[in-house]
Amino acid sequence: MREAVIVSTARTPIGKAYRGSFNNTHAQTLAGHAISEAVKRAKVDPNDVDDVILGAAAQQGTQQGNIARQSLLRAGLPTSVAGMSIDRQCASGMMAIATAAKQIIDDGMNITVGGGVESVSLVRNENFRMDNARDPWLENEMPELYMTMIETAETVADRYGRSRERQDEYALQSQMRTAHAQRNGFMDDEIVPLNSVSYTHLTLPTTGD
């Protein structure tokens, strides 16, 4: 059986939604930047890329119309390269990577790109209608289908007895680990600076806030 291997990785820094470093940067620009660098790091000819699969949970606004196809063109890949977008909500990027591997293992492709992109700052705005977003029958018969992540988190906390204090403690520990990793350059190799922003702008090194 054929095997799929990861030969390169690249990502952009992460910014806060609506007020962060990339709040006005299109998803195509972000994803295209990462794709371009990943292909370059892999030392492959862009013309040899068979497919680009990207996951995105909010495929509307600037992320509609096959964001994978738009992003690969933004990356400078030729029009002969196919693109496919996947929506599996929070697991969209993971599913895209798994699908990219499947394209090689089962479908005979040789080079694929898999990843995820999300720029909620440019998709959820005053024109994002939610009044008819839920199917009435599904909402009545299976209301859990439309649970938000915060509702899911509350359910998990109640079910498994996870206190708010313990979660806050773990969150702070995670933030401090991130700040430590940034200070020591542990993530430098995987981050591709974009417009001089090179680190994830989520933590303050001194406090972890």
Language model features: what each stretch is:
Residues 11-13, 24-33, 166-202:
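N-terminal extracellular/periplasmic Venus flytrap/periplasmic-binding protein-like
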Residues 27-42, 67-71, 96, 149-156, ...:
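Short, well-ordered amphipathic alpha-helical segments that serve as non-catalytic structural scaffolds
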Residues 38-48, 160-161:
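Phosphate/pyrophosphate-binding loops at sites that engage ATP/ADP/AMP, CoA/4′-phosphopantetheine
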Residues 87-118, 157-186:
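Active-site-proximal alpha-helical scaffold in enzymes
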Residues 101, 106-160:
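Flexible glycine-/small-residue-enriched beta->alpha junction loops
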Residues 201-209:
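Single conserved hydrophobic/aromatic residue that forms the stacking wall/gate
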